[in-house]
Structures are given as C-alpha cells and as structure tokens.
Amino acid sequence: MSSTFNPAASSPDEEETGEVKIEDQCVENKQSTPASCSSVSEGSAGSSHKSPTIASPATVSPTHRYLGRTSGPIRRAKGGWTPEEDETLRQAVDTFKGKSWKNIAKSFPDRTEVQCLHRWQKVLNPDLIKGPWTHEEDEKIVELVEKYGPAKWSIIAQSLPGRIGKQCRERWHNHLNPDINKDAWTTEEEVALMNAHRSHGNKWAEIAKVLPGRTDNAIKNHWNSSLKKKSEFYLLTGRLPPPTTTRNGVPDSVTKRSSSAQKRVFGSVAQTSSVTTDVNNLAEDGNGQINSSVPVEEVVAASRMTSLNEYARSPQLPNPEPLPENGGAANNGYHLYYTPQIDYYRASEVDTQRMYGNECGCSPSASPVSFFTPPPCRNVHSNGSTPRSPESYLREAGRTYPNTPSIFRKRRPRVVVQDNNNAKKTDEAKEVDQKVNDGKDSSEIQNNGSNAYNLSPPYRIRSKRTAVFKSRQLEFISREEEKADDETKSSEKDMLIDGDSQLLG
C-alpha cells in the first residue's frame, strides 16, 4: 500500500505533517553542501509535482527483508555518498529521465528513492544554484509569498530557475520575513534563551516559540557565538555577566587599564621631579653636603628619566596632563602627541658633562656624585616656565640614544698635568724653544702664547717645522751626546775643508 502527498491541495498544517513524515525517512548527509531532508513537494527534476510513493512493509523487496523492520523507516544510509554512488546516480537519472525514482533507487541496495531524489536535487543537479541570493530573487520571493502565502514553496520555486523549495523557504523565514526582529539582543531575551535551552537543549524550533520575532537560525547563531560562553556563569550565579560597554569603540576594561598605567607613570614622574627639585635647592644653597634620605642611586636614575619607554618608541618628555577621554585623540585630529613639559626634567652632572664638557659650571674636582642645575634664564613666561631654544630639545632627544655620536657634543679640552720628576727636562725644552722662537714673527709668537697647549699649531715654514721637530728631539739627548755630536760635526767640516784645499791646489 502506498500513499501520495499533494502539497498544492493540502493545508499548511498538513504540509508540515507530511514534511515530518518524509524527513523521518531521510538520512543526514555528510557532504559539505547542504543536503538535509525536507519536503518532497519542493519541485522535483521531473515535470510531475507529486511526491514519489513511500513503500510500506508489504512492498519491501525480498532482498531487503533481512532488516526485520515492521514499522518506521525501511532503510537508512550507512554513511555519506561515495563518488562511485554519485556517478551511478547520474547514469540512472539519465536512463530514466529523472522521473521514475523507484526504478532509480533499485540501483542502490542501501538507498531509498527519497534519498536518491534529495541527493540529485540538492547536490548533483547541474542546474542547481548554490550561490548567494540576488536582489531580483528576493523581490520575486516576496511577490510570490504575497500571492500564494508562506506555504506553497514548490510552486514558488518554479518561478526561480535553479532554486528548490527548501531554499526559498529558508530564505523567507531567515531573512525576508518582515516579522523578523533584527535588533540587538536584550538581557530579557538572553535570559529567556538560557532557560529555554536548559529545558529543550538544542531544539531551536522549540526555543523559537518562546522568543517571538527570533528565527531558529538566529537563535542558534547567537547561542553558539555569545551565550554558550556565559552559560557556566549563569548556572552558578543565576544571572548573566555584566556587559562590556565601549567608549568610542574602546572597551572600558582597556580604558581603565590605560588610565591606571598613566596614573602610575605620572606619579613616578611627579615623584622624580620633587626629588630633583629638593636636590637642586640644596645645590643652590652652596652647600656641598646632601642631607637627603633618598638614596643617591635612585636620584641619579630618576634624573635620567626622559620618556615613558625609551626603547619602545620615539623619545618624548613625560606629560603630567591626563589624556582626553576619546582614546588619546586631540581636538586637532593628531594622535598621541603631547606638549612637552619642561619643569619635569633635570639633567644630571654626569650627562651634562658628557655633552658640554667642563664649560657649564661643572668642576672636575667636585665630588664623584654631584648634580647640575642649569643657569636660570632671564626671560620667564607668566606661567613660570622658561623659554627654550630648539637646540635644547634636540640635545635632550639625542641623549636618549646611548652609544651614538652626537653633533652637539663638544670635545673635552685636554689638561696637561706636569710631573715634578720631569720638571728639569721641561725647563730644558723651554730653553730650546725660546732659542728657536727668536726668529719667529711677533704675531706668531703672540698667537702661540695665548694657547700654549694647542694641539693644532699654526702653519709654519718647512725649515721652521724642522727646527721645532729637532728641538723636541733634544729633550731626550744628554749633554755627553751633544758634545759627541759637536765633535763629529767639527771633524767632518775639517775633512771637507782639507778636501777642498787639495782640489784647489
């Protein structure tokens, strides 16, 4: 005995009942393409719109009686379709012109005619369109739903080439239905979804009855993407975790962490400035003693602090002003730019002496650990800050790059310290230099007298340079060697005179 199901002549409730009966006989397809079972009334490949007959236990072929089933589905698929089965199905459809699905199913011992029909309609049919929906297709579905109602999907699919009834039905219920609520989920809806999921599990159609305006597909997506992670917290406390509010696209948690970090940094900068100010006040009093309880190492380390992170980004002076609430963006559109504050920086003597040498008031004979206070400027603004030149900003920025030569650093002048043991030799060298300098011009002597230890002497004639070089060599010649040289020179002169007299005679 067989029964048929005509969707065109049945009511929506009867069609849904028929779909449930047909879907009980379907098998889940494991292919990547959608192959879930739906109503057989969704437009088959043939011209007839009647569903194929459903075999009863009395019409089971003898080859399948070994299953021993007397009720319910007759055959179940043992797995996904193999490439060999797909090729066999194509050949059978070509043989029977896609009309007799009972004869087509005879080619598969473990497949029913419904499974073969769905495999062909949803996967193998070359005329099937699986791509995204176009605007024209959506308008056509809306027009046909107004004409036929949201039930006769097989008739609606006939007006959309390449689409089947199941695709049209899912497109309407998930996207095109004007009753769909597409607003953001409220807390009440999420709590209702939590409670319904505890009762029904993953039965999204049952849960959708509790949430009017939400489709089962939207409910499933929201559960898997958001609420599934909050379910443990809800089961423990009975309420949802507090939502993470955002401020201009930045979560409050990130804003709080950044503000706390800024407070710590600015607090350390303020503490550094206060310690440095105390030390400078002691230096201005003229006392060489430092009676501060702060360790000297900490003060030195704090005085060298010029940026929040010297090695992670470009150098900048610390800014005690808080950042604006819009995530650090200024009113003029620039990001992460702060006006440098001068009052929070004090250079130490070690750094200043390395840059400027001993010309800024730093004495080499001072204590090993001392501090330098820059000389006060006469021009003072109304707010108490002193004007600065661009070179000072460049010098401070250059200090943040260690082991790098700087164009602003000056050479240290060499200081020659005389030793008492070499005083005698130095006096002799001075006497020789005095004899050599007798033939020099007065202007040259005056220039040399102003800078006695200049490493770059003025230009001299070659003969004078040779004389100076010889005079420097005399420092290492003793009196006896000088006498021996004089005797040798006199004997050479006598020999030359005798030789000349013989040639003339």
UniProtKB/Swiss-Prot annotation:
Pfam families according to UniProt: Myb_DNA-bind_6, Myb_DNA-binding
Major site of localization recorded for this protein: nucleus
GO biological process, one term: response to ethylene
InterPro entries linked: Homeodomain-like_sf (IPR009057), Myb_dom (IPR017930), MYB_TF (IPR050560), SANT/Myb (IPR001005)
Subcellular location: Nucleus
Disruption outcome: In double mutant myb3r3 myb3r5 and triple mutant myb3r1 myb3r3 myb3r5, up-regulation of many G2/M-specific genes leading to larger seeds, organs and embryos due to overproliferation and ectopic cell divisions.
Residues of the HTH myb-type domain: 73-124, 125-180, 181-231
Cited SUPFAM superfamilies: Homeodomain-like
Transmembrane segments: none
Database matches in CDD domains: SANT
UniProtKB keywords: DNA-binding, Nucleus, Repeat, Repressor, Transcription, Transcription regulation
GO CC terms of this entry: DRM complex
Record's subunit section: Component of a DREAM-like complex which modulates a variety of developmentally regulated genes and of the mitotic genes in proliferating and differentiated cells. Associates with RBR1 in both earlier and later stages of leaves development. Interacts with CDKA-1 and E2FC, but not with E2FB, at later stages of leaves development.
Function, as annotated: Transcription factor that binds 5'-AACGG-3' motifs in gene promoters. Transcription repressor that regulates organ growth. Binds to the promoters of G2/M-specific genes and to E2F target genes to prevent their expression in post-mitotic cells and to restrict the time window of their expression in proliferating cells.
Name under which the protein is recorded: Transcription factor MYB3R-3
Organism, scientific name: Arabidopsis thaliana
Gene name for this UniProt entry: MYB3R3
